[in-house]
């Protein structure tokens, strides 16, 4: 079994330090105190220019849970398109509906837009009403490459 050491960071300094200390991959966020938000574009660009290991970018427009309005989804799509333009390794995202079920429609739409980037569903699944049921369904989506829980 291959163990991949992924480090979640919210600064360029932490990303460089993680790489120097043996991280295999970075999950780049902002506001880790809010469980991670989409980082600023400039941080994404600088981190990509300084690191040699794969970078996956958190796509989460606000820290008030995982339910998103259309304006939030538009911001998420814009962030995904930006990440695609920079050839990051992947994006990390997740959506819930108003009843705290994993929103497969929104996730599938975002994952399809993100192609060919890797798409990882994040901790939103932990807040869903049916973690196991959600997991079993989400892994059937061919555009989803993994789940972080």
Regions found by a protein language model. Give the residues of each.
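Hydrophobic faces of well-ordered beta-strands that scaffold small-molecule active sites
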Residues: 3-7, 26-28, 55-59, 91-93, ...
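Conserved, mostly hydrophobic/aromatic
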Residues: 18, 47, 83, 110, ...
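Active-site mouth loops of central-metabolism enzymes
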Residues: 1-11, 59-77, 121-131
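Ordered, amphipathic secondary-structure segments that act as subunit-interaction surfaces
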Residues: 78-95, 99-102
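Glycine-enriched alpha-helix->loop->beta-strand junction motifs that scaffold or abut catalytic
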Residues: 19-26, 51-54, 87-90, 113-117, ...
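Glycine/Thr-rich beta-alpha phosphate-binding loop at enzyme active sites
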Residues: 93-101, 137-149
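Active-site-adjacent beta->alpha loops and helix N-cap segments on the catalytic face
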Residues: 12-16, 32-53, 70-74, 95-115, ...
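N-terminal pre-domain/capping segments
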Residues: 1-26, 31-38
């Amino acid at each position: 079994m291959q163990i991949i050491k992924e480090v979640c960071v919210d600064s360029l300094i932490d990303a460089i330090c993680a790489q120097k200390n043996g991280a295999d991959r970075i999950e780049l966020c902002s506001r880790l105190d809010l469980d991670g938000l989409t980082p600023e574009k400039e941080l994404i660009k600088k981190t990509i220019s300084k690191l040699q290991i794969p970078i996956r970018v958190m796509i989460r427009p606000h820290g008030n849970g995982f339910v998103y309005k259309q304006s939030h989804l538009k911001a998420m799509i814009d962030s995904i398109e930006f990440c695609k333009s920079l050839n990051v390794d992947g994006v990390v995202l997740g959506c819930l509906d108003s009843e705290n079920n994993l929103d497969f429609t929104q996730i599938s739409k975002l994952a399809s837009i993100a192609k060919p980037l890797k798409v990882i569903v994040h901790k939103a699944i932990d807040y869903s009403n049916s973690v196991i049921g959600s997991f079993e369904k989400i892994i059937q989506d061919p555009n989803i490459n993994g789940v972080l829980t």
